[in-house]
């Protein structure tokens, strides 16, 4: 974000982010990564220092304060590079440690940037002064910004939470923690302010209508003053410290609108009510009341305005400088009003507050000679009792003589003064705490609105970790809370980190850091933990703090690593045990913990409170039950537990609720830091800040970050910044992907490659590696800058020296001129010249003055004329301006209409998006319902099984009961045991009843959820969870019943006692059995109903899916219509922009009209007419746009109606479900039917198994057929091998091949199957690609035709526009003469233009008709393509036969190749000397390297060719690829059969001639054969057989080897000759080059012939296709023209009035026809010229090829010439296609002209018939030319076929040329080495000669310059001498 983007933050910008200048200054400061470090310091924790020396594991460094220190090397931590100074996210620091974090916060705080990110944290430091960063301008700037798009701020955290809530549909929470005074409360208020502002935007109208109660936003904001008044107080660190924790939930609707809010509070500091330290004070409300701002309060509460009159609130300070208690009282009272408190409620709260103050003033004294207390005055007690609505005497009696319960009786107990004082304080604290809780509940009731709410954002404001010298029970609760929150953060943080790694594809082993704190948490909250032991001790009356300590040590000391025995230090409070928290070790003092945990009250006084006449007080204590409260029968257990709930248990319960809330939300973390204890702005106390960083988990988060990869950079940014480290890794000229570039760059650097990972979009670094890269980058930059500086200094010095030389030369010239002037200034003629010169100028001046006067008169006259002209123009300009204003008004109206249309279009788009969202949501719901249905079906089956088991259990139970009837004798104790067991059964039955009700509620809930479709997904998920829980409970109950049955069986053996008692128990058991039966039946009914419901929901789901498909189809239609609407709108927008541009141009021209001429006025009028035309076009486009929008609206209304119908259907389905519910309850036979269905399904499965077996047998038969086909292929392969053996005349080797193939049969069978499968896949892919290619070509042709038609329509419209312009010009001339006549003509022209626009629309409709006909043609062509595919399959069947023919053809070609090779060898022998003497080093070097590669390739090809079996399989695999080529060859072979027969006859003659040579080569081959066999012996027997099958190839190799031997001998001879005379070699080289160039002409001529024939072939094919298309287009256009002609004849009468105008147009049309005719002829000439240029280019290409001197490079080019020719052919085809398109355009133009002529014929009636006949004759001529062209194309097709055959021959010849040229590479092998050496020597000598020559030339040049200067100087001297002599003689003569 640059400085310009920061401007949106206004005055807050400097407090949020550094400016660009500051960032540059920080980055350019001096820095040394190896020396700049942090060292530990006793006072400052860490200080910056520079390393001086290293020695023996220790480092000596100088701190920034100038102090020299020596520390261990492992204590030194590196500083971060300047790039990271004041970084906004500390997780991005490359060196992530404590001092780096501390100093980053310190530097940002010094710049007043108080917010900083630390990974997931936002750390904020209290500035202790007001900063302008919370204004409305800042709120608006942060709204909708992502975290990365704006500087750190609490508003950014808030907005991200709000946006996540809306987008992710998930509840959010913001956790704000920190010590007192760190700014938690302020930040909480800012968060609430932000939500109230952004969520209430757009709802302002309600604010104006609300009464004094205030809007919801106001109430949420005003809740803070009320809470602060009763819950905040001044502390040592903070003047407005919150003494309670709070969790504020702000609820929002589905659209993000504020719905409601509620507040939960934690750990209110009750002790502050009665006790404060010296520097602190009580809660604000006490001092606000005493401020006397509302005197009526003082009277009502019976108090003064002096705080020191009241003991409870005057123990510390009573005033705070930064707080105005009077104003705060008014704010509190106003908050109560806004929150809707009644006057009675406000007064009751004030009364209780005043009563507490009076409570503290009540005094008691000890009775004489007794230990009992008595009141010391009753005045304060009377006031307190009055305010509380109590009796004063009863209050005092209850305090001094409380009644306690002893046994079943109440007795009065005496209290001493200390006990009374404690009871008094406890009662005051209880009253205040309950009043505070009531106020919070009352605020929640106000904020609870009836508006629908979907999500909430929770704001947690709670105290941070506390480690004091004296830590008590309150600190344990706070620290336990923070331990849980830190565990929550750790788990959440690393889960997100892991998700980032997973998303980026980083391999990572999960580490659950949340478990790090589990040991400490378990120690506190688990059974037998600290809290549990504390609560246990509170239950024992004789327990003390010391017994509590003893239990702690017995259970945990030595057993838990987190529990330790403290070390007591003198001067510090005593500690009883220590806990190791994540923030550090805390020593706790347990004194008073039991009392604090029980928090007892004087129950006598509490009973008085319950009976108070003050309604609020009685309500506060109405639900209080003391420890001795009566226990009601049957419910005593619950009552007792609730009454004796300890503080620790209540805190744990609230904490668990809080953690549950937080786990269900997406959390955001804010950590508040207090910078110093003195509240000084801008001062950082390092130890204090470090302590808080440890306590609030920032450093813990850093520890987690260091385990992973904390630094990450996008690939593009990394490449851009660090490419300088190794530019060679990422070359500048070529494109390399950013990720690949980063990988190459990092792999090329000398760094640990385990320190980074590559993700999908980023590169991840371990901590410290990025700093190392920065250091390397700085070093690299310093070297580069040093080099640049040196070069720059050199350039500057040379420039300065050049200036000095130029200055010297200038001085010399000036000196020479001055000397010359001094020599001639006294010369008499010169003096005369000085006198006459001014006179000459004065005469010239007079002449100039005369001419200027004449010019002035003439200009004055012209000025008067121009002035008159200007006035005339001004008058005209006024009228034009008026017209322009009218036009602007019209344009504005059109723009308004367009804006309305755009708004409607936007609305349609929004509706479409909403529909898409609904469709998506419904799809998701359907998927969830299907999943639920599947799960419920499975559960249903499971429950059915369980029901059957239960039935069996019941049967067993009946048998057991029958046996029990016979068992009589048992003791009464056994009967009692049985009774207890039956009571357990009662409980089980009660549980089952509850579960049944829960199931019914879940069922009803599911039905309700069906009504509300928006909540269906969530409610179904909840119902699923509930059902799973119920199923688990049922399983548990079944297990219990099984246990009961076992117990009963055991009891059966024992129950042989009393028959009467057992009979009674039997009766009870029978009743229980009946009840269980009834419940099980009901359970069955319910399960059946659920199953029916599931089936209905499945049916409903299928219906919804159908509806969804219909909606999707409708949405697609809407999208297509919207796309059309967008295109129309784009056209209108373009037209509007053109109009605006034209309007601006007219305005500019009108402004410059003062100097305009009549031509400019005409232009303005012309533009005006164009505006009229465009305005009418815009109006028509707008009407069309509105019609389209109306259609879209109609379709949208239809879709909405359909959705409504769907909702109605759903309602009907719901009613149907409710009706069928009762019917399905009676269907008990479903289980049996299900069994029958299962049996049927089993039978079906057996049938399916049989069918599968049949299919398997069919597949086996197919496999056998495949095996037979493989065997056939194997036999064919053997046959081919036999043929090869016969051709090579080696029968013995053939027999070995057959035996070898027999052994490899099994292996090749599998290979053939694989290859056959690959062949089928490739054939399918090829067919699909061919089909797609044809379709694409056809579509392309259609699109091209449509484009051409649109272009023609556009040209037609342009012609109409130009015609309209000419008509406007005529009307304008008429308007100047006669305004009335001009008006009529304009009206007629308007009608004419309207008619023409209508014609254009009809033309568009005709184009649409063409499109439909093209679509039909497309379908027809697709059918043809399918037929062609059938033909292709047939051709595949003939592939085997063609393969055999191809091999025979290959034999013939091989013989011709052999003949060509022999002729080529003869040619080579004549060129040996030329090639051996070739010394063109650079070309030979490249060609030699390439030739080596080709040689290796050739050898590999020989080896591959020798593998005959693999060749055969490869041919099978590649046959699919060459199907089309084989088809062409098949056609060519039939045509070339006769030619080949004649060629065979010639070949036989040549073969006889070559047999002798073959025999000689055979002898030499036998010698080399042994060596080849030795090389091939390592291969398989397959290689041996293949070698024999290719003897002819080996023969050719033998000839090449022979040539190589001869060339080697020749090379030795040439070597000696070259050593003798290098100059003679160069002469021979040039001669050899010429010979080589001539030798290559034959190859090039063949290539040129191939090129020409290929071009002709492709041109003919393309021309044929184009002609076919043209014929179809012409036919369709003729039909359209005939239809249009009939329509035009109907409007003859309407066009009669424009006959004169039509005559003029006819003349213009005839001229255009002539012009187009001339253009057509010129295009034909141009085509011929281009053909000539093409042939010339071909000849130039041939000449360029002939200039190639290197034989090897020529061979390479011979191989690649085919591709080059194909490219050139493509270019020429494009040119031809372009010419054909031009031709079609001309034909279309002719058709258009014919159409125009028909039009003109109807307009002109008789006058235009002759012209029409001429045009028709011209059209017929063009048609004749078209026929001639078609005949030519037919002839070219015939020539094309001949050329194809010739191309094939040339292709084979070219391939042989390539192979021969490759063989030649070995011939120059050793020669090149010598040539290189000689060439190198020659180059060195030449280089030395060039050097000497350049030196000589330089000296020669300097000598010539010196001679020239000497000559010039000498000539000057001679001239001067001559002049001096002349002057001397003249002086003598004068004397």
From Swiss-Prot:
- Domain IQ: residue ranges: 781-810
Q: Where is this region: Actin-binding?
A: 655-677, 757-771
Q: Where is the Myosin motor domain?
A: 85-778
Quote the cellular component terms of the Gene Ontology held in the record: cytoplasm; myofibril; myosin filament; myosin II complex; sarcomere
Q: Composition bias, kind Basic and acidic residues: at what positions?
A: 1923-1935
Binding-site positions, ATP: 178-185
Query: Where does the Myosin N-terminal SH3-like domain start and stop, copy by copy?
Result: 32-81
The record's listing under Pfam families reads: Myosin_head (PF00063), Myosin_N (PF02736), Myosin_tail_1 (PF01576)
How are the domains described in the entry?
Answer: Limited proteolysis of myosin heavy chain produces 1 light meromyosin (LMM) and 1 heavy meromyosin (HMM). HMM can be further cleaved into 2 globular subfragments (S1) and 1 rod-shaped subfragment (S2). The rodlike tail sequence is highly repetitive, showing cycles of a 28-residue repeat pattern composed of 4 heptapeptides, characteristic for alpha-helical coiled coils. Four skip residues (Skip1: Thr-1188, Skip2: Glu-1385, Skip3: Glu-1582 and Skip4: Gly-1807) introduce discontinuities in the coiled-coil heptad repeats.
What is known about its subunit structure? Muscle myosin is a hexameric protein that consists of 2 heavy chain subunits (MHC), 2 alkali light chain subunits (MLC) and 2 regulatory light chain subunits (MLC-2). Interacts with ECPAS. Interacts (via C-terminus) with LRRC39.
Q: What is this protein called?
A: Myosin-7
